[in-house]
């Protein structure tokens, strides 16, 4: 499967996560973005996803917010870790051309997240798709903002990646 991995704010693509996905036979694409100086990051990701014919999105924090909207706009399934939904579409300069809708979404929320308020994230996803079969929200009591390798691999396995 062709996967786009999107890192968070002030971060970079995580080689361990990319390697974990690749070890299962996936082709992983990842851009290093400086969201603070590149206001067109979303557009760049969208063009890249289309050009590489991406089939699945994995995103973390601000990358999770970008991944959420890419999934909605391009009709791609996604796995989102602590998506920074509080940041908002407008603040991230996300312009939608159309909205096909995400066919399948997994959202992992760390209950000990010290950066992204887990309750705001949980409520956001409950409000947009209450009891939807197309969305699974996983609340991890032990998880902070950083995703440890064991949790990443376990969720990856659970999702089927």
Positions of predicted regions on the chain:
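Acidic catalytic loop of the alpha/beta-hydrolase fold
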Residues: 11-12, 111-117, 145-146
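Active-site catalytic motif of lipid deacylating hydrolases and related acyltransferases
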Residues: 1-52
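Short beta-strand/loop motif that positions the catalytic acidic residue
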Residues: 101-102, 106-109, 113
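Active-site nucleophile loop of the alpha/beta-hydrolase fold
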Residues: 8, 31-34, 76-88, 110-112
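Conserved alpha/beta-hydrolase fold motif
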Residues: 56-58, 78
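Short alpha-helix in the alpha/beta-hydrolase fold that links the catalytic acid
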Residues: 17-18, 93, 117-127, 152
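Catalytic histidine-centered segment of alpha/beta-hydrolase-like enzymes
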Residues: 39, 139-151
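Gly/Ala-rich beta-loop-alpha elbow adjacent to hydrolase catalytic centers
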Residues: 58-67
């Amino acid at each position: 499967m062709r996967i786009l991995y999107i890192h968070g704010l002030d971060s970079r693509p995580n080689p361990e996560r990319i390697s974990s996905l690749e070890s299962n036979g996936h082709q992983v694409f990842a851009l290093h973005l400086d969201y603070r100086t590149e206001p067109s990051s979303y557009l760049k990701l969208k063009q890249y996803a289309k050009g590489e014919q991406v089939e699945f999105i994995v995103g973390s924090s601000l990358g999770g917010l970008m991944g959420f909207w890419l999934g909605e706009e391009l009709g791609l399934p996604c796995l989102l870790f602590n998506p920074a939904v509080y940041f908002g579409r407008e603040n991230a300069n996300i312009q939608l051309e159309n909205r096909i809708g995400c066919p399948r979404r997994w959202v992992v929320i760390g209950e000990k997240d010290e950066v992204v308020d887990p309750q705001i994230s949980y409520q956001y996803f409950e409000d947009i798709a209450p009891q939807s079969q197309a969305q699974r929200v996983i609340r991890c009591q032990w998880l902070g903002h950083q995703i440890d390798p064991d949790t990443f691999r376990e969720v990856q396995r659970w999702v089927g990646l």
